[in-house]
Amino acid sequence: LFLTMGACNNTPKAPILLEAEKTIEKQPDSALNYLGRVNSDLQDALQAQEYYLRALEIGEDSKNYTLLIKIYNNLGTLYAYQDINDMALPMYKKVLSYLELEPDSVKTAFTLRNIARIYSLIQKSDSSIIYYKRAISYSAIKNKASILIDLGNLYLSLKDYKKAYQCIEKAEPLINNEKTLYPIYLSKGELYIATNQLDSAKFYLNHCVKSSNIHTRAGSLYHLAQIAQKEKNINDLIKYSNLYEQTRDSIVNSSHFENI
C-alpha cells in the first residue's frame, strides 16, 4: 500500500530548495509546506517533516484552511509512507476536521480512504469498513472504483467472500480501460482461489501478468504459483515461482535504489 521513504540528509541542496528558501519571509507557512513537499520528493523524510512542522507552527492559528489541509495531508502521507501509522492517523483526522470548515467532496473522499487504509493496517477492520463506506459516499464516479476495490480486498482478507465479490463487481463497470482493470482482475483471482474456483482464478491472473505495474505482476505470478501448487503442476510451479522471484527482486532492488 505505502512505500518506505529513506532519508538522504547528506545530499547537497538542490537549486529549487535554495530558491524556495528565499520566499520564506514573504509567505512562510506556504513556502515551508512547499519545501516539505520538495524534500519528501527527494526522499529526505526527516527534513520534510521539519519543514511541515515549522509550517504548522506559523500557520496553525490562521484561517487559511486550504493550506492547513495541505500541510496535515502531507504530514499524514509522509508518516504513512514510513509505516508510522499511529502518527499518520491523527494527521488525516485533522485534515477531515478542516474539511468540515472548508468542504471539498473530492478531498474528503480521499482523506476518508486514507484513514480507512490506516485502520486496515492496524487491524481495526470495523473502523476501516466504516471509513471506506463514507469515502464511497463522497467519491466521484471516476474515483469510486479504486475505493470499492480497497473495500473488497479488506472483505477478502476477512474471508467475507460474498461482500468482497459485491464490491469488486460494483467496481468493474466504473472502469473504462484495460490498464486500470488489472487491479480488479488481481482481486478476482485471489477471490476465486479462496473459493476454490481455480480455472476462473487462472483466467483473471493470466490477464494481470500483462500489467505494466510491477506490483500487480508480482501478485499475479505469486498466485499463479499457488494454483500450480494446489494442482500439483510441477512445471507451472517452477515457472511461476521463478518469474515471481525475479519480479520480487526487481521490486526490492528498485526500493533499495530509491532509499540510497
What would you call each of these model-derived segments?
Residues 5-7:
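C-terminal motif of bacterial Sec signal peptides marking the signal peptidase cleavage site
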Residues 21, 33-41, 66-81, 106-121, ...:
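Conserved alpha-helical positions within TPR/SEL1-like repeat arrays
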Residues 9-30, 46-49, 86, 126, ...:
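Hydrophobic positions within repeat-based interaction scaffolds
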Residues 132, 137-211:
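Eukaryotic tandem repeat interaction scaffolds
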Residues 24-27, 44, 63-64, 103-104, ...:
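Short coil/turn linker motifs that delimit alpha-helical repeat modules in TPR/alpha-solenoid proteins
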Residues 54-58, 63, 94-103, 133-137, ...:
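Amphipathic alpha-helical segments of tetratricopeptide repeats
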